[in-house]
């Protein structure tokens, strides 16, 4: 029987003392695999910064999630482009300015709520009525996109909350959306794309909270398909005013 070629564990002496401590003992090895010894005492990162370091399964999950997310974005972008093209054609072909979807008297009353407004022309409420109609239609379309992503057939108020948090021009509506609706079903998915692997949590867009249980690079399943990771909206004011954990325990 040949002697083992593995080095025997060394005995180290700590400077300034007489007590002897055994050095790190290598893990048991098999003939076909080398021993794995930690390179240093510093803790390894929670996830690799280089995608090449991921396992084949994680790479496949990330690629599927990224592909699904890109296809979903392209489909939704086409829907929005078609929506605005139809609205422009509708505006250009409008000849009836007497019948409107929204009551002009109610719109005029809202406009007069501003004390600085003294006189309102006859065509101003007409423009506001059309603008409000388009606003409702677009917000409904964006909300319905979130409904379909979650494999549902009924538009709910948390879908509207998702549409608001996803769209920059709807930021002025964030404060009127209940926080319970923002937290439901991963509301607030960013539209810029999937975050790159290895990016720390503090580099995500301001105002988005990454759930701790969500593994970076892993996708959320939507009806058997791999989807994009979810993000939850966190109120910036609450982020600043939230006391440290030590103070809360007191």
UniProtKB/Swiss-Prot annotation:
Pfam families: Histone
Disulfide partners: none
Main location: nucleus
One GO cellular component term: nucleus
Record has Nucleus as a keyword: yes
PANTHER family: HISTONE-LIKE TRANSCRIPTION FACTOR CCAAT-RELATED, NUCLEAR TRANSCRIPTION FACTOR Y SUBUNIT C-4
Subunit architecture: Heterotrimeric transcription factor composed of three components, NF-YA, NF-YB and NF-YC. NF-YB and NF-YC must interact and dimerize for NF-YA association and DNA binding. Interacts with NFYB2. Interacts with NFYB8, NFYB10 and HD5/NFYB11.
Protein name (database record): Nuclear transcription factor Y subunit C-4
Source organism (scientific name): Oryza sativa subsp. japonica (Rice)
Gene transcribed to yield this protein: NFYC4
């Amino acid at each position: 029987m040949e002697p083992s070629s593995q080095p025997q564990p060394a005995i180290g002496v700590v400077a300034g003392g007489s007590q002897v401590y055994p050095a790190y003992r290598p893990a048991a090895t098999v003939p076909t695999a080398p021993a794995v010894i930690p390179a240093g005492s510093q803790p390894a990162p929670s996830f690799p910064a280089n995608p090449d370091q991921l396992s084949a399964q994680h790479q496949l999950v990330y690629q599927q999630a990224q592909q699904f997310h890109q296809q979903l974005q392209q489909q939704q972008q086409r829907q929005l482009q078609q929506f605005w093209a139809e609205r422009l054609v509708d505006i250009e072909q409008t000849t009836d300015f007497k019948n409107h979807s929204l009551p002009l008297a109610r719109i005029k009353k809202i406009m007069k709520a501003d004390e600085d407004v003294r006189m309102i022309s006859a065509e101003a409420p007409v423009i506001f009525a059309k603008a409000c109609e388009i606003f409702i239609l677009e917000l409904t379309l964006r909300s319905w996109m979130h409904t379909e992503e979650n494999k549902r057939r009924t538009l709910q108020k948390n879908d509207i909350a998702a549409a608001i948090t996803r769209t920059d021009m709807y930021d002025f509506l964030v404060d009127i959306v209940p926080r319970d609706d923002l937290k439901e079903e991963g509301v607030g998915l960013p539209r810029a794309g999937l975050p790159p692997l290895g990016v720390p949590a503090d580099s995500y867009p301001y105002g988005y909270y990454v759930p701790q249980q969500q593994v970076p690079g892993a996708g959320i399943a939507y009806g058997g398909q791999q989807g994009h990771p979810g993000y939850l909206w966190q109120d910036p004011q609450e982020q600043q005013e939230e006391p440290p954990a030590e103070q809360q325990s007191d």
